């Protein structure tokens, strides 16, 4: 009887499931404003200067899509590449790029935004996954200086 109990306990212990984490896909958000804090991406503020903006990631150059997302918002957590686009948030407009796998470490990944006036900004992203704690440590840099997300570019 004792052997059977030990066997049942061993089977229950060894067949237990580990911690399952649904990692949220990463989307890069970039706000653009002037020195006074005015949203330069808002169509009401004449954002025609955006035409011709591109982003380069891993050698691939993607043009800005100013029409926004047309796909429905769902609760699905799968990664869907949605390109480089202009989106409207709660209180402001922003440029979004992605989505990228949330369960992946990123080591100093660089994104270069090329503006129509021939200037550019370099965004660097570093991410370390900690499966034990169920979180990730993210470091964002704008032109080499640490910043927060969403990234705010002053033009």
What are these regions (language model features)?
Residues 1-4:
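Positively charged n-region of N-terminal signal peptides that target proteins for export
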Residues 13-16:
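C-terminal motif of bacterial Sec signal peptides marking the signal peptidase cleavage site
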